[in-house]
């Protein structure tokens, strides 16, 4: 069965379910291997366009880590990360603007066949930040302090799909790199979104990081601190889980870390309760 046939069958199967989502809002953070593989990229764009066709408001926030790292290496600089966050100096910011807000963003918009509108956190005052204050200095990494959704509301009202690069600006006009998972979460909170979806390169949150069979399919947010203390949530998973927890604690119904290596993972996260990544929720 070819990819087109598979997608057509999935569309037919999903019609009734997606009709129930009409008028609802989903924020998707797109990144990882699904941005590198041409085949996976195609299925992601198919999924996003299908949701749009059913009247579902979709906001796509993207990373671009591999492209940024490539740009850094071309400058003779080795990328550095601490706790999953990129250490960012002025040279890195320049690369982020060129690669993330430029090349990556516009190529994604092009794949959305006239339905996408390319934005970054600087545009329309969308994301205001301040320098992230931490025990370790991450450089020009921002902490989001305000989200102005005016430009997003205008785009969604025009039935467009905002495609947002994760950069932001402070009150002095200094540009910062901002974690894309955090951007997606804060935008989802500000929009009052119905669902937050974060794409990653693993099956989800694993009780044993070396065994995908140990997938934790559902996590109640009150468990998160314990899971961090146990080392189950660590490294790059920390900002992802923090983003999910933030969304849920702000009133969001469901946050979902999905396996971006699976074809049509976005659609499946809506259509199926089967083990597809890790769903975060709050016990009522």
From Swiss-Prot:
GO annotation terms (biological process): arginine biosynthetic process via ornithine; L-arginine biosynthetic process
Keyword Nucleotide-binding belongs to the record: yes
A Pfam entry, by short name: AA_kinase
EC category name: transferase
Pathway(s) served: Amino-acid biosynthesis; L-arginine biosynthesis; N(2)-acetyl-L-ornithine from L-glutamate: step 2/4
A single Gene Ontology CC term: cytoplasm
CDD domains with a match to the protein in the record: AAK_NAGK-C
Localization in the cell: Cytoplasm
Assigned keywords, A-Z: Amino-acid biosynthesis, Arginine biosynthesis, ATP-binding, Cytoplasm, Kinase, Nucleotide-binding, Transferase
Enzyme Commission no: 2.7.2.8
Cytoplasm is among the record's keywords: yes
Catalytic activity: N-acetyl-L-glutamate + ATP = N-acetyl-L-glutamyl 5-phosphate + ADP
Site (Transition state stabilizer): 29, 240
Family classification: Belongs to the acetylglutamate kinase family. ArgB subfamily.
Classification via NCBIfam families: argB (TIGR00761)
The name this protein goes by in its record: Acetylglutamate kinase
Organism: Haemophilus ducreyi (strain 35000HP / ATCC 700724)
Taxonomic path: Bacteria, Pseudomonadati, Pseudomonadota, Gammaproteobacteria, Pasteurellales
Gene transcribed to yield this protein: argB
């Amino acid at each position: 069965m070819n990819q087109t046939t598979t997608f057509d069958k999935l569309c037919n199967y999903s019609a009734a379910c997606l009709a129930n989502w009409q008028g609802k809002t989903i924020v998707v953070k797109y990144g990882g291997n699904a941005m590198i593989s041409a085949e996976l990229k195609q299925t992601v764009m198919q999924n996003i366009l299908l949701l749009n066709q059913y009247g579902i408001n979709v906001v796509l926030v993207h990373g671009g880590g591999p492209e940024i790292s490539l740009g850094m290496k071309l400058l003779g600089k080795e990328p550095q990360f601490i706790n999953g966050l990129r250490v960012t100096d002025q040279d890195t910011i320049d690369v982020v603007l060129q690669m993330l807000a430029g090349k990556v963003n516009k190529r994604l918009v092009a794949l959305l066949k006239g339905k996408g509108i390319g934005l970054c956190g600087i545009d329309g005052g969308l994301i205001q930040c301040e320098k992230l204050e931490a025990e370790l200095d991450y450089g020009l990494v921002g902490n989001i302090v305000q989200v102005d959704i005016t430009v997003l509301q205008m785009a969604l009202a025009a039935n467009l799909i905002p495609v947002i690069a994760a950069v932001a600006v402070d009150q002095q006009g200094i540009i910062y790199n901002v974690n894309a998972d955090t951007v997606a979460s804060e935008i989802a909170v500000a929009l009052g979104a119905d669902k937050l979806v974060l794409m990653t390169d693993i099956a989800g949150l694993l009780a044993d990081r070396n065994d995908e069979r140990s997938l934790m399919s559902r996590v109640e947010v009150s468990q998160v601190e314990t899971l961090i203390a146990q080392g189950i949530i660590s490294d790059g998973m920390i900002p992802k889980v923090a983003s999910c927890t933030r969304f849920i604690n702000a009133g969001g119904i469901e946050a979902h870390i999905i396996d971006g290596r699976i074809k049509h993972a976005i659609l499946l996260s809506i259509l199926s309760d089967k083990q597809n990544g890790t769903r975060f929720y709050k016990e009522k």
